[in-house]
Swiss-Prot record:
It is an enzyme of class 4 (lyase). Signal peptide: none annotated. The record marks 38, 137 as: Transition state stabilizer. The keyword Metal-binding applies. SUPFAM superfamilies: IpsF-like (SSF69765). A divalent metal cation binds at residues 11, 13, 46. It catalyses: 4-CDP-2-C-methyl-D-erythritol 2-phosphate = 2-C-methyl-D-erythritol 2,4-cyclic diphosphate + CMP. This is 2-C-methyl-D-erythritol 2,4-cyclodiphosphate synthase. The keyword Lyase applies. 4-CDP-2-C-methyl-D-erythritol 2-phosphate binds at residues 11-13, 38-39, 60-62, 65-69, 104-110, 136-139, 146. Its cofactor is a divalent metal cation. Involved in the biosynthesis of isopentenyl diphosphate (IPP) and dimethylallyl diphosphate (DMAPP), two major building blocks of isoprenoid compounds. Catalyzes the conversion of 4-diphosphocytidyl-2-C-methyl-D-erythritol 2-phosphate (CDP-ME2P) to 2-C-methyl-D-erythritol 2,4-cyclodiphosphate (ME-CPP) with a corresponding release of cytidine 5-monophosphate (CMP). InterPro entries: MECDP_synthase, MECDP_synthase_CS, MECDP_synthase_sf.
Protein backbone atom coordinates (compact mmCIF):
# COMPACT_ATOMS: atom_id res chain seq x y z
CA UNK A 1 0.00 0.00 0.00
CA UNK A 2 1.19 3.50 -0.84
CA UNK A 3 2.25 5.63 2.11
CA UNK A 4 0.28 8.61 0.78
CA UNK A 5 -3.39 8.59 -0.20
CA UNK A 6 -5.38 11.46 -1.74
CA UNK A 7 -9.15 11.84 -1.56
CA UNK A 8 -11.64 14.29 -3.05
CA UNK A 9 -15.03 15.16 -1.62
CA UNK A 10 -17.97 17.19 -2.87
CA UNK A 11 -21.25 18.22 -1.31
CA UNK A 12 -24.12 20.55 -2.14
CA UNK A 13 -27.25 21.62 -0.30
CA UNK A 14 -30.11 23.79 -1.50
CA UNK A 15 -31.35 26.71 0.54
CA UNK A 16 -34.66 26.17 2.32
CA UNK A 17 -37.45 28.69 2.54
CA UNK A 18 -37.04 28.89 6.31
CA UNK A 19 -34.27 29.39 8.82
CA UNK A 20 -32.03 32.26 9.76
CA UNK A 21 -28.58 30.67 9.75
CA UNK A 22 -26.43 28.07 8.07
CA UNK A 23 -23.67 25.91 9.53
CA UNK A 24 -20.41 25.80 7.56
CA UNK A 25 -17.21 24.38 9.03
CA UNK A 26 -19.00 24.05 12.35
CA UNK A 27 -19.63 27.81 12.42
CA UNK A 28 -23.14 29.28 12.70
CA UNK A 29 -23.43 31.95 10.02
CA UNK A 30 -26.44 34.28 9.96
CA UNK A 31 -28.36 34.08 6.68
CA UNK A 32 -31.92 34.77 5.58
CA UNK A 33 -32.45 31.07 4.74
CA UNK A 34 -31.20 27.80 6.14
CA UNK A 35 -30.07 24.76 4.16
CA UNK A 36 -32.19 21.72 3.30
CA UNK A 37 -30.53 18.68 4.83
CA UNK A 38 -31.06 15.55 6.89
CA UNK A 39 -28.23 16.61 9.22
CA UNK A 40 -27.13 20.19 9.95
CA UNK A 41 -26.28 20.63 6.24
CA UNK A 42 -22.63 21.55 6.77
CA UNK A 43 -21.40 21.23 3.17
CA UNK A 44 -17.77 21.87 4.10
CA UNK A 45 -17.57 19.16 6.75
CA UNK A 46 -19.52 16.74 4.54
CA UNK A 47 -17.07 17.29 1.66
CA UNK A 48 -14.14 16.86 4.06
CA UNK A 49 -15.62 13.61 5.41
CA UNK A 50 -15.99 12.33 1.84
CA UNK A 51 -12.42 13.34 0.98
CA UNK A 52 -11.02 11.57 4.05
CA UNK A 53 -13.14 8.46 3.52
CA UNK A 54 -12.24 8.38 -0.17
CA UNK A 55 -8.52 8.66 0.51
CA UNK A 56 -8.75 5.60 2.75
CA UNK A 57 -11.04 3.75 0.29
CA UNK A 58 -13.72 3.62 3.00
CA UNK A 59 -16.62 4.62 0.74
CA UNK A 60 -18.52 7.85 1.29
CA UNK A 61 -20.42 9.74 3.94
CA UNK A 62 -23.74 8.19 2.89
CA UNK A 63 -22.38 4.71 3.56
CA UNK A 64 -21.33 5.59 7.12
CA UNK A 65 -24.11 8.05 8.02
CA UNK A 66 -27.11 7.27 5.77
CA UNK A 67 -29.87 9.86 5.48
CA UNK A 68 -32.34 6.99 5.86
CA UNK A 69 -31.19 6.48 9.45
CA UNK A 70 -33.27 8.66 11.80
CA UNK A 71 -30.43 8.75 14.33
CA UNK A 72 -28.59 11.15 12.00
CA UNK A 73 -31.54 13.54 11.64
CA UNK A 74 -30.25 17.00 12.55
CA UNK A 75 -26.81 15.53 13.32
CA UNK A 76 -23.96 17.86 14.18
CA UNK A 77 -21.48 17.35 11.34
CA UNK A 78 -18.56 17.97 13.67
CA UNK A 79 -19.51 14.71 15.38
CA UNK A 80 -19.58 12.99 11.98
CA UNK A 81 -16.11 14.35 11.16
CA UNK A 82 -14.72 13.20 14.51
CA UNK A 83 -16.15 9.73 13.86
CA UNK A 84 -14.48 9.60 10.43
CA UNK A 85 -11.15 10.69 11.94
CA UNK A 86 -11.46 7.97 14.58
CA UNK A 87 -12.03 5.34 11.86
CA UNK A 88 -8.92 6.59 10.03
CA UNK A 89 -6.76 6.44 13.15
CA UNK A 90 -7.99 2.92 13.93
CA UNK A 91 -6.75 1.82 10.48
CA UNK A 92 -3.39 3.56 10.89
CA UNK A 93 -3.95 6.71 8.84
CA UNK A 94 -2.69 10.17 9.76
CA UNK A 95 -4.08 13.32 8.14
CA UNK A 96 -1.44 15.22 6.17
CA UNK A 97 -3.57 18.16 5.11
CA UNK A 98 -7.08 19.19 4.09
CA UNK A 99 -8.02 21.88 1.58
CA UNK A 100 -11.65 22.97 1.19
CA UNK A 101 -13.30 25.32 -1.29
CA UNK A 102 -16.75 26.70 -0.50
CA UNK A 103 -18.74 27.80 -3.56
CA UNK A 104 -21.42 30.34 -2.60
CA UNK A 105 -22.71 33.65 -3.89
CA UNK A 106 -23.93 34.48 -0.37
CA UNK A 107 -23.37 34.80 2.48
CA UNK A 108 -19.79 36.04 2.60
CA UNK A 109 -17.55 33.39 4.11
CA UNK A 110 -14.32 35.37 4.65
CA UNK A 111 -15.22 36.61 8.16
CA UNK A 112 -15.78 33.00 9.30
CA UNK A 113 -12.93 31.10 7.65
CA UNK A 114 -10.49 31.28 10.55
CA UNK A 115 -13.09 29.86 12.95
CA UNK A 116 -13.81 27.08 10.45
CA UNK A 117 -10.11 26.21 10.30
CA UNK A 118 -9.90 26.12 14.10
CA UNK A 119 -12.91 23.76 14.32
CA UNK A 120 -11.64 21.43 11.60
CA UNK A 121 -8.12 21.28 13.03
CA UNK A 122 -9.53 20.51 16.48
CA UNK A 123 -11.89 17.80 15.19
CA UNK A 124 -9.12 16.21 13.11
CA UNK A 125 -6.47 16.43 15.85
CA UNK A 126 -4.04 18.26 13.55
CA UNK A 127 -2.26 21.60 13.52
CA UNK A 128 -4.22 24.47 12.03
CA UNK A 129 -1.36 24.75 9.51
CA UNK A 130 -2.68 21.49 7.98
CA UNK A 131 -6.11 23.00 7.26
CA UNK A 132 -6.97 25.43 4.48
CA UNK A 133 -10.43 26.80 3.72
CA UNK A 134 -11.23 29.25 0.97
CA UNK A 135 -14.40 30.54 -0.64
CA UNK A 136 -15.34 31.62 -4.12
CA UNK A 137 -18.40 32.52 -6.14
CA UNK A 138 -19.46 31.40 -9.60
CA UNK A 139 -19.86 35.02 -10.73
CA UNK A 140 -23.66 34.65 -10.48
CA UNK A 141 -23.69 31.59 -12.77
CA UNK A 142 -25.45 28.31 -12.02
CA UNK A 143 -27.40 27.29 -8.93
CA UNK A 144 -24.88 28.75 -6.48
CA UNK A 145 -24.75 32.00 -8.46
CA UNK A 146 -28.54 32.23 -8.38
CA UNK A 147 -28.34 31.75 -4.59
CA UNK A 148 -30.23 28.46 -4.75
CA UNK A 149 -27.66 26.62 -2.66
CA UNK A 150 -24.07 26.17 -1.53
CA UNK A 151 -21.49 23.67 -2.76
CA UNK A 152 -18.11 22.62 -1.47
CA UNK A 153 -15.09 20.67 -2.73
CA UNK A 154 -12.43 19.22 -0.44
CA UNK A 155 -9.16 17.41 -0.96
CA UNK A 156 -7.38 15.45 1.76
CA UNK A 157 -3.97 13.83 2.00
CA UNK A 158 -3.56 10.84 4.29
CA UNK A 159 -0.36 9.17 5.34
CA UNK A 160 -0.43 5.47 6.15
CA UNK A 161 1.60 4.85 9.28
CA UNK A 162 4.24 2.15 8.91
CA UNK A 163 3.68 -0.88 11.12
Amino acid sequence: MSLFRIGHGFDVHAFSETGDLIVIGGVNIPHERGLQAHSDGDVLLHAICDALLGAAAFGDIGKHFPDTDPSFSGADSRNLLRSVVSKLHQKGYKIGNIDGTIVAQAPKMAPHIESMRVNIASDCNVSIDCINVKATTTEKLGYTGRKEGIACHAVALLEAQKN
